[in-house]
Amino acid sequence: MPTLTPGRVRHGVVFTLKHPEGSPEEADFLKANSELASIPGVEAFEIMREVSPKNPYRFSLVMEFVDRAAYDAYSAHPDHVSFVRDLVVPAVTDFLELDSEAL
């Protein structure tokens, strides 16, 4: 991702799933995450596998928004709310969310 310009927001989540590594359930969950990119306001989207042994997480998801208002609208969007409720809560064992604004 390019350098964040002032005012833009980068939303990141690192997480670990309940599903066994390499399982069909893991693959389905990761594929479903791409649906978040279609929610209005999402301007950049990446989902990645964590490679550092320095943290306990297995995956990361990063997206960018033009500003806080766009991020807030995304967070409250019904598709995001239902995604978290129906897919994230049952499947994720641990996570850390980082929401950052460029200086």
Model-derived segments and spans:
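Short S/T/G/P-rich N-terminal loop/turn motif that feeds into the first structured element of a domain
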Residues: 1-59, 66-76, 99-103
